[in-house]
Swiss-Prot record:
Cellular component per GO, a single term: cytoplasm
Keyword set, alphabetical order: Amino-acid biosynthesis, ATP-binding, Cytoplasm, Histidine biosynthesis, Hydrolase, Nucleotide-binding
Entry-linked Pfam families: PRA-PH
Matches recorded under Gene3D superfamilies: MazG-like
InterPro entries xref list: HisE, PRib-ATP_PPHydrolase-like
GO biological process: L-histidine biosynthetic process
Source organism (scientific name): Methylobacterium sp. (strain 4-46)
UniProt-recorded Gene Ontology molecular function terms: ATP binding; phosphoribosyl-ATP diphosphatase activity
EC number: 3.6.1.31
Protein name according to UniProt: Phosphoribosyl-ATP pyrophosphatase
Length: 107
């Protein structure tokens, strides 16, 4: 297992988002507004799902990395801290899966 973490990627994305859009793909995505990085996130998620269905392990690893990167770009562009997402995951995992899902009050 690598020592590289989601928090490490978050720091990199935040740093690159603060750069000039002329010099950073991340900054260019963030500067384009929320629709562009959200669209990329959706595209990468679909590609990851396709790789999973096809049993393409290497493709799934690659696409999952793209999903995580683009999710962090969306979070940064939306002003949402990774820590907030992690706190929500921690809250949810404190209960069993079905009990947690029922507590959300969604249909």
């Amino acid at each position: 297992m690598t020592a590289f973490s989601l928090a490490d990627l978050d720091r990199i994305v935040r740093s690159r988002a603060a750069a000039s859009p002329d010099q950073s793909y991340t900054a260019k995505l963030v500067a384009a507004g929320p629709a562009k990085p959200a669209k990329k996130l959706g595209e990468e998620a679909v590609e990851a799902a396709i790789a999973a269905v096809q049993g393409d392990r290497a493709g799934l690893v690659s696409e999952a990395a793209d999903v995580l990167y683009h999710l962090l770009v969306v979070l940064v562009g939306s002003g949402v801290a990774l820590e907030d997402v992690m706190a929500e995951l921690e809250r949810r995992t404190a209960q069993g899966g079905l009990a947690e899902k029922a507590s959300r009050g969604r249909p």
